[in-house]
Amino acid sequence: MRLIVAGAGGRMGRALVRAIAETDGAVLAGALEAPESELIGKDASVLAGLPASGIEVSADLWSLSAKADGILDFTVPAATIANVAVAAERGLIHVIGTTGLSASDMAVIRSVTSRTAVVQSGNMSLGVNLLAALVKRMAQALDESFDVEVLEMHHRAKIDAPSGTALMLGQAAADGRKVGLDQRAVRGRDGLTGARKAGDIGFASLRGGTVSGDHSVIFAGPYERITLSHHAEDRMIFAHGALKAAKWAFGKEPGLYSMSDVLGLDV
């Protein structure tokens, strides 16, 4: 399977290049960066700490996509939305791990899924997706006397909050209780907020150091508390998850899929 890595010079992009090199049946077919990037023309494999592959970083997705089967996209919303149109036109499988996507961004992504297979998830790791399944079941089993709080921590360079994974876990809790997350989410409390409302789903974000990703979902009830947690020790778990998603989507009918579909989980 021939794959393009979008954002090839970033932390996740370099991890994806390494994951492709470690995955049987996967080949690096292209490396994409923004036109103004100083990495244009550099060997993508060398940037990832590997022997030279001859695949140079380019800003031209249209040309790269002529000899590719899919694109792995962990970039920023504006870049992902620009890539969506080209991927759909070329019929590329599009694996999207970009976080911070708005409702309008998701509408654009959905609009192309009649033409190609898209796998979109706030987190590509097996552990987090299993955690989401557990959170949904826990929320189904516990009534609103158990307050739900989602706590996440990431490295100092992360630019969006709450993380896509935190929102995914909050959505799992909302789905378990059959409520809308938009109506129940409370983000970043500060000042005189008043008492907590029953049924709220709270979010808190921490930033610092080099943390790849820590997430906890707390169910706080009368006189007891249940905490479900996941700690990512290396971003390679996300990269290998993205490879798994791409291989799973190869040959699938056009549509919008999630990692729950890839892993066969009921979330």
UniProtKB/Swiss-Prot annotation:
Catalysis performed (reactions): (S)-2,3,4,5-tetrahydrodipicolinate + NAD(+) + H2O = (2S,4S)-4-hydroxy-2,3,4,5-tetrahydrodipicolinate + NADH + H(+); (S)-2,3,4,5-tetrahydrodipicolinate + NADP(+) + H2O = (2S,4S)-4-hydroxy-2,3,4,5-tetrahydrodipicolinate + NADPH + H(+)
Active-site residue list: 154, 158
Any one GO cellular component localisation term in the record: cytosol
Pfam families associated with the record: DapB_C, DapB_N
First-listed, main subcellular location of the protein, grouped into a coarse class: cytoplasm
InterPro entries (UniProt xref): DapB_C (IPR022663), DapB_N (IPR000846), DapB_N_CS (IPR022664), DHDPR_bac (IPR023940), NAD(P)-bd_dom_sf (IPR036291)
Origin: domain of life: Bacteria
GO molecular function: 4-hydroxy-tetrahydrodipicolinate reductase; NAD binding; NADP binding; oxidoreductase activity, acting on CH or CH2 groups, NAD or NADP as acceptor
Functional pathway: Amino-acid biosynthesis; L-lysine biosynthesis via DAP pathway; (S)-tetrahydrodipicolinate from L-aspartate: step 4/4
Localisation: Cytoplasm
UniProt cross-references to SUPFAM superfamilies, sorted A to Z: Glyceraldehyde-3-phosphate dehydrogenase-like, C-terminal domain, NAD(P)-binding Rossmann-fold domains
Disulfide-linked positions: none
Gene3D superfamilies in UniProt: Dihydrodipicolinate Reductase, domain 2, NAD(P)-binding Rossmann-like Domain
Residues where (S)-2,3,4,5-tetrahydrodipicolinate binds: 155, 164-165
Keywords: Amino-acid biosynthesis, Cytoplasm, Diaminopimelate biosynthesis, Lysine biosynthesis, NAD, NADP, Oxidoreductase
GO biological process entries: diaminopimelate biosynthetic process; lysine biosynthetic process via diaminopimelate
EC number: 1.17.1.8
Keyword Hydrolase: no
Binding site for NAD(+): 7-12, 33, 97-99, 121-124
Family the UniProt entry places it in: Belongs to the DapB family.
Function field: Catalyzes the conversion of 4-hydroxy-tetrahydrodipicolinate (HTPA) to tetrahydrodipicolinate.
Protein name in the entry: 4-hydroxy-tetrahydrodipicolinate reductase
Recorded name of the encoding gene: dapB
